[in-house]
Amino acid sequence: MNKVVLYCRPGFEKECAAEITDKAARLEVFGFARVKEDSGYVIFEGYQQDDGEKLVRDLPFSSLIFARQMFVVGELLRDLPPEDRITPIVGMLQGVVEKGGELRVEVADTNESKELMKFCRKFTVPLRAALREAGVLTNYETPKRPVVHVFFIAPGCCYTGYSYSNNNSPFYMGIPRLKFPSDAPSRSTLKLEEAFHVFIPADEWDERLANGMYAVDLGACPGGWTYQLVKRNMWVSSVDNGPMAQSLMDTGQVTWLREDGFRYRPNRNNISWMVCDMVEKPAKVAALMAQWLVNGWCRETIFNLKLPMKKRYEEVSQNLAYIQAQLDEHGINAQIQARQLYHDREEVTVHVRRLWAAVGGRRDER
């Protein structure tokens, strides 16, 4: 199997294609991407027969910025007979994947696919039963086995394949289902909540998003991101010339500092989190984030980089490379991840975690 399907935000197919082509080449997997504008997915086709399998096995899904999901597929199944769509799909998957732990019948995230989504939901139950009977799926769901994907691009037309549960998105269609909290000051709060789900393993939340931590929110007004920190019982310094929502101030956990986020300097050295969602050129934001990390002003940060109209992948790559270079220069080991989240628009969200410092005299930041 030499093809890989990648879901993405509609309108960002070119960025997703540029990224997979670049990162596949680094693994010495060469091929080309098939792109249909505003389709919400990209198909990368390698020149060698096992290229798709190699990518989903060896390319860390966490390293991809513009992809919501990644799985290997075979040839497109066309014109499935309405009276029996199941048999061809089962036949396509037999011998390809054995004892998958989960089935996802999916569509791309577009308005055109909403009607098809209703069919997918109804179709999942009988297809799952048939795949279990054929030995393609285990008799019970398990996260320890591959995920079987059936991806419909049109009625009666689908790709079939699989992903590895330790190298994919755990979410259906690659989208976490989050509910907007009615007491949040703005919908931007969902960006930070989604970032926590994507970047921080669930079993580490109690340690890394703990009660009583100190946090800073740069460009905080009206408080969508501060809300998420307060919700986790952190003490938050919210930095912005604009006012904060009174509901947040009433908690007693928020200190509002009327300052420019680019000029603010923290006066304490035990800040666990700094978050930032400012509308500014990405290079300027990247430089500020690097400054915070190099100076040890925070242990972890989540921030947004607003994207230009053109060469978005190149711009983000340059910004991330700049931050990495600054950390390397100062002997700081850190983990960097970036993703265009479901709740992001013309932007990507970046997470950086300082692990330890290799410079004498600088304390361990873990």
Swiss-Prot record:
Keywords: Cytoplasm, Methyltransferase, rRNA processing, S-adenosyl-L-methionine, Transferase. GO terms for biological process: methylation; rRNA processing. The keyword tRNA-binding does not apply. Its main location: cytoplasm. It comes from the Bacteria. Gene3D superfamilies: 3.30.2300.20, 3.30.70.2810, Vaccinia Virus protein VP39. GO terms for molecular function: S-adenosylmethionine-dependent methyltransferase activity. It is an enzyme of class 2 (transferase). It is found in: Cytoplasm. Its EC number is 2.1.1.186. S-adenosyl-L-methionine binds at residues 188, 221-224, 240, 260, 277. InterPro entries: RlmM_FDX, RlmM_THUMP-like, RNA_MeTrfase_FtsJ_dom, rRNA_MeTrfase_M, SAM-dependent_MTases_sf. Catalyzes the 2'-O-methylation at nucleotide C2498 in 23S rRNA. Belongs to the class I-like SAM-binding methyltransferase superfamily. RNA methyltransferase RlmE family. RlmM subfamily. Monomer. This is Ribosomal RNA large subunit methyltransferase M. The gene is rlmM.
